[in-house]
Amino acid sequence: MGTWARALLGSTLLSLLLAAAPGALGTNPGLITRITDKGLEYAAREGLLALQRKLLEVTLPDSDGDFRIKHFGRAQYKFYSLKIPRFELLRGTLRPLPGQGLSLDISDAYIHVRGSWKVRKAFLRLKNSFDLYVKGLTISVHLVLGSESSGRPTVTTSSCSSDIQNVELDIEGDLEELLNLLQSQIDARLREVLESKICRQIEEAVTAHLQPYLQTLPVTTQIDSFAGIDYSLMEAPRATAGMLDVMFKGEIFPLDHRSPVDFLAPAMNLPEAHSRMVYFSISDYVFNTASLAYHKSGYWNFSITDAMVPADLNIRRTTKSFRPFVPLLANLYPNMNLELQGTVNSEQLVNLSTENLLEEPEMDIEALVVLPSSAREPVFRLGVATNVSATLTLNTRKITGFLKPGRLQVELKESKVGGFNVELLEALLNYYILNNLYPKVNEKLAHRFPLPLLRHIQLYDLLLQTHENFLLVGANIQYRRV
């Protein structure tokens, strides 16, 4: 990333904002990122540091001309070897412009210009050096944030202005009248050049550095081998007094086949929180599209194998071993193997409340006898229900989860082999689910839900709250230079 990407928007925060692609009109976002006044203050501080380095690259052209010297007539002068050894930006603010974008306002900037001068008049040859000090420089830049039809972010400069309040010149030489004439020429020429060069440098940097950098942000991010997440913008960022809200689609989808979901994201009523630089409001829509994506991919389907049952229980997937559970099974299908196939009935809806993240999964477990012909014949089907709560944790870039299951409740839905001991089978399934299925799911949750951040951004002072229909993540931000 170029220094300008950090300079103008303090890309530490802009990286939170933009991953474009327009959404459907009238729908709610799945994720909202809110940049607070504290976040904008941090962006301004980071931006000033980087902008100082960028403006030190401003090149000043040589300048020549002629002027009249009393008693000597007209003479030629030239200013050359102009350098900027110091460029200090002392104060700056980054504020939202409602309905437009962002404004970067810099005041009390200071520039030191060092150069040489020479004067020629027939036989007269004079030359020496000078130092020019610009004080009270102000710079104002307005940026428009948006997205293009491809779904990627855009940033343009709508206006830029700079103004020099005071110039002091320290010029070396002996002829006072000549030096006074030179001073007026240097003051006028360099004031004009500096004011135009500063804005030109800024505008070129937006086009050449910041915009290409934003274009590298992917619209989608792969979570794992099964699913990805759509971080497209649903509209241009909303600038209001003291904050900037960015609306992301926030939809998780299966990688092998994406299709529209048949439910909408709920409206989120964000609290008026300002203790952190940035807040992520993640609606239950995000979690429910994740459940749907993994259901469509078949990730929730499972098989109970002999290796999953403790050896000391002496229970294997045979009709003989299942005699304690289903007495008639071994009589009707003597000495045959069993297959136990589990499926989640449908995508599971996650309910976010002020207390917790809750889910109520329902599963079917079907038993099939493997006949001597290798054909499979279904013999009974069980319904399994439970309550699941999730513990969520944060790190510098992602959210992780851990499921805490409740006890299973098993019912017999269908049987071709008569009745059986549901309580005993329920105990066996509780052991299996607790020791095999949930660890598998928790392993997947450990892969983490990535937040919409660009590279080199880290979060700290993390805050996690659950609200009705959404999860609120607050954080401060640090840009780690590389």
From Swiss-Prot:
Disulfide bridges in this chain: 160-199
Keyword Cell inner membrane: no
Signal peptide: 1-26
Keywords: Antibiotic, Antimicrobial, Disulfide bond, Glycoprotein, Immunity, Innate immunity, Lipid transport, Secreted, Signal, Transport
GO biological process: acute-phase response; cellular defense response; defense response to Gram-negative bacterium; defense response to Gram-positive bacterium; innate immune response; lipid transport; lipopolysaccharide-mediated signaling pathway; macrophage activation involved in immune response
Tissue: Detected in blood plasma (at protein level).
GO molecular function: lipopolysaccharide binding; signaling receptor binding
Record note on quaternary structure: When bound to LPS, interacts (via C-terminus) with soluble and membrane-bound CD14.
Function: Plays a role in the innate immune response. Binds to the lipid A moiety of bacterial lipopolysaccharides (LPS), a glycolipid present in the outer membrane of all Gram-negative bacteria. Acts as an affinity enhancer for CD14, facilitating its association with LPS. Promotes the release of cytokines in response to bacterial lipopolysaccharide.
Name the UniProt record assigns to this protein: Lipopolysaccharide-binding protein
